[in-house]
């Protein structure tokens, strides 16, 4: 797709904004929403030709783990904490099973893509340390 005419920012300015928001602790999805809603940049990839994560990797600021995997791990840790206090909550137990299944499938994909090290496995105890 072509670059929208109404975008007045240069590629360098957009990259500086992305790096600034990343230093402030914003996730890649939050950065994209901020750029869309406050700066009128509909899609970073359309404008710059690179995704936000590619820009962060090029500047050595990318996270160790992919954002979607980390979000699932956070949800699993929160449900495990909830189940520690409410062991009879069967709906949450099922939800935890489903989320952990998603984590394993996604981790398998990322290992094949090279985003995670070979042999990486989801471990709930390590996940709790990873998130906190």
From Swiss-Prot:
Query: Could you identify this protein by its name?
Result: Small ribosomal subunit protein uS15
Per UniProt, subunit arrangement is: Part of the 30S ribosomal subunit.
Gene Ontology cellular-component terms listed: cytosolic small ribosomal subunit
- Which HAMAP family has this protein been placed in? Ribosomal_uS15_A (MF_01343_A)
Q: Which family does it belong to?
A: Belongs to the universal ribosomal protein uS15 family.
Pfam families recorded for this chain? Answer: Ribosomal_S13_N (PF08069), Ribosomal_S15 (PF00312)
CDD domains to which the protein is assigned, alphabetical: S15_NS1_EPRS_RNA-bind
Organism from which the protein derives? Methanobrevibacter smithii (strain ATCC 35061 / DSM 861 / OCM 144 / PS)
Gene coding for it: rps15
GO molecular function terms here? small ribosomal subunit rRNA binding; structural constituent of ribosome
Q: Which UniProt keywords apply?
A: Ribonucleoprotein, Ribosomal protein
The family database entries (InterPro entries) matched by this protein are listed as:
Ribosomal_uS15, Ribosomal_uS15_arc_euk, Ribosomal_uS15_N, uS15_NS1_RNA-bd_sf
User: Which PROSITE patterns does the UniProt record give?
Assistant: RIBOSOMAL_S15
Name any Gene Ontology BP term: translation
Q: Does the keyword S-adenosyl-L-methionine apply?
A: no
């Amino acid at each position: 797709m072509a670059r929208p005419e109404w975008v007045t920012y240069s590629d360098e300015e957009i990259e500086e904004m992305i790096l600034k928001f990343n230093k402030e602790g914003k996730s890649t999805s939050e950065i994209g929403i901020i750029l869309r809603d406050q700066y009128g940049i509909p899609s970073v990839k359309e404008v710059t030709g690179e995704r936000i994560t590619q820009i962060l990797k090029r500047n050595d600021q990318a996270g160790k783990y992919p954002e979607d995997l980390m979000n699932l791990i956070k949800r699993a840790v929160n449900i495990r904490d909830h189940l520690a206090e409410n062991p009879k909550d069967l709906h949450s137990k099922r939800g935890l099973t489903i989320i952990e299944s998603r984590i394993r499938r996604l981790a398998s994909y990322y290992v094949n893509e090279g985003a995670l090290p070979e042999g990486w496995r989801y471990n709930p105890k390590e996940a709790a340390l990873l998130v906190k």
